[in-house]
Amino acid sequence: MKSTYDLRSLNVVFINMPLRETAVPNNMPQGPLLLATNLRDNYGVNATIIDLNAYRIDGRHLTNDEAFCLIQQHFKAHGEPALVGLSGMITTLRWQESVARIVRELAPDTFLVSGGGLATELGSDLFKYIPELNGVALGEGDDIIVKIALDAKTRGWRNAKFVYEGGRPKDLNSIPFADLSLLEKDVFGNELLEYYIGNPIWGASANNSSAASFTMNRSTNFISSRGCPYNCAFCYRGAQGERNYGARSAENLAEEFKLHIEKYGVDFIGVVDDNFAIDHKRVVDLVPLLKPLNIHWGTHARLDESAEFPLMAEAGCVYIGFGAESASPSVLR
């Protein structure tokens, strides 16, 4: 533990929202995992995760009453939280509205913050939809989560509204790998981590945006880079003025590959970057590091980066997802 802040034993709960109902859960929530790992390992925080997205079974997600029961039992088992962080894409607004009411009923004195895609898109306007919130966190949360936890620990925030603006750590290699054991079991003993690992992250059977047919038995996912240097008008990053790109080194990425292979016994890894192939040197450096691991993996890239694809294939890449944003040249311009 390396901290000048006294956050030891602070109870923090991250709640991840459900996404599409038609696909089984196969993409572990990297944001909550990274933040919870950081708070626990570096600051001694008692950080836990409630992953509502893990309960999409047989074409349905949790009902509101089921979510209430799950959150209630989690709070009883781990203690009332000082801080609750909601996380989800912009499509999760209705869920966040409902969960915020549940949290406020069960833990009236908790500091309640929303972060992630929805919060970054709406900013302070999110308070209009979710008045129960004490704070809205914009951008990346690696650094500001400590500030948020410190604010939650004090009692000066009552009746106040906070907007936090997150930046990106200068060295992405310094961020601890997400500890997937935070998802190992829920409060009822359900083995969520094994459920995720057993569901293919991509491929025809995943029933998500990928239609390619290939086989995997155990798969995990993580992120190796953030942002994008391009400024495409049709992309949400361009619309938000985000052109800040950062990537972990090839060596750091290879270490996480090894960890997942050895610890979780996976035969496929999904690197869920927005755009993996931007850095040519990193792709070149990866080949001798990943090739001996004999692991299949997939990621996202642009079609005009196809020069990198043979190198990626040599390193074990068997799947590349790309977005057909528009068939109109004028829109793409």
Language model features: what each stretch is:
Residues 1-13, 18-20, 154, 158-221:
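N-terminal [4Fe-4S]-dependent radical SAM core
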Residues 11, 82-83, 268:
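Structural motif
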Residues 15-17, 52, 115-117, 274, ...:
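Cofactor-binding loop segments of dinucleotide-utilizing enzymes, especially the Rossmann-like FAD-
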Residues 22-32:
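Glycine- and acidic-residue-enriched helix-capping/strand-helix junction motifs
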Residues 38, 42-179, 183:
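Glycine-rich beta-alpha loop elements in corrinoid/cobalamin-binding modules
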Residues 181-333:
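Radical SAM [4Fe-4S] cluster-binding motif and immediate context
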